[in-house]
């Protein structure tokens, strides 16, 4: 059995609440030490401010990724909307910057939409790159499915029918449907509320108003 810890929406702020983050991260590390996942996967929004990332937040993020890597064989990271420079997508995003700076061989950054065969496990990651919203990997990227591999979709955006913390239901024709994801599992981020569809849906977050609340939601072991 392959054990995977699915995280999303960490939202490291620029110059605030770093002590609280460290306290919450320590609780996460203790849980990871107990569960011993082979893979940890962060599905978007490592940072909170996409326009300008402070040096302080870069240090917190770099330490966080390095620390996570000590509790797994590999750490998979993809960016979310808060990690990208929306007005200039040709610029290097904040997550890619940190991954390159820490130069940790356990940390794998998926930089585009497509199918990525894992080098350690019989998994194919199906990445829906956030800035490439018009690309559906299953329809637009030629690929022959390997029955001997586990396919896991990685997606950071609302899913049609999902609900946020105040009860708003996301229902628009431009939102992806759960049936668009053809993998064996789907790991999502963006909505900040634990919920389930046909595939597993959960995320870990530091809440804007109640930083400890996510401890009760937990994080998913798949």
Task: Describe the residue ranges of each PLM region.
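Conserved beta-sheet core of the metallophosphoesterase superfamily
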Residues: 159-160, 165-208, 213-216, 220-222
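Conserved catalytic scaffold of divalent metal-dependent phosphoesterases
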Residues: 83-177
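A structural signal for short, well-ordered beta-strand segments and their strand-loop junctions
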Residues: 76-78, 125, 154, 187-188
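Residue-level preference for short coil/turn positions at secondary-structure junctions
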Residues: 36, 71, 119, 146-149, ...
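Hydrophobic helix-cap positions at the C-terminus of alpha-helices
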Residues: 31-32, 68, 141-145, 214
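Core catalytic region of metal-dependent phosphoesterases/phosphodiesterases
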Residues: 2-3, 10, 14-115, 179
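Active-site metal-binding loops of divalent metal-dependent hydrolases
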Residues: 8-12, 45-47, 81-83, 127-129, ...
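Structural motif
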Residues: 2-4, 39, 121-122, 150-152, ...
């Amino acid at each position: 059995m392959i054990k995977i810890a699915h995280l999303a929406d960490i939202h490291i702020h620029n110059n605030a609440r770093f002590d609280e983050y460290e306290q919450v991260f320590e609780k996460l590390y203790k849980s990871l030490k107990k569960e011993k996942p082979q893979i940890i996967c962060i599905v978007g929004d490592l940072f909170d401010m996409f326009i300008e990332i402070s040096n302080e937040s870069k240090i917190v993020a770099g330490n966080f990724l390095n620390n996570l890597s000590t509790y797994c064989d590999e750490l998979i990271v993809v960016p979310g909307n808060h990690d990208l420079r929306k007005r200039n997508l040709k610029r290097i995003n904040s997550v890619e910057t940190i991954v390159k700076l820490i130069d940790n061989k356990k940390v794998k950054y998926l930089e585009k939409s497509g199918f990525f065969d894992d080098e350690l496990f019989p998994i194919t990651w199906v990445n829906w790159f956030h800035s490439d919203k018009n690309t559906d990997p299953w329809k637009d990227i030629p690929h022959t499915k390997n029955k001997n591999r586990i396919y896991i979709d990685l997606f950071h955006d609302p899913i049609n029918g999902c609900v946020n913390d105040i009860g708003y239901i996301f229902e628009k024709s431009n939102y992806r449907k759960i049936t668009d994801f053809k993998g064996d599992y789907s790991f999502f981020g963006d909505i900040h509320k634990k919920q389930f569809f046909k595939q597993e849906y959960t995320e870990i977050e530091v809440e804007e108003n109640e930083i400890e609340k996510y401890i009760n939601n937990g994080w998913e072991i798949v």
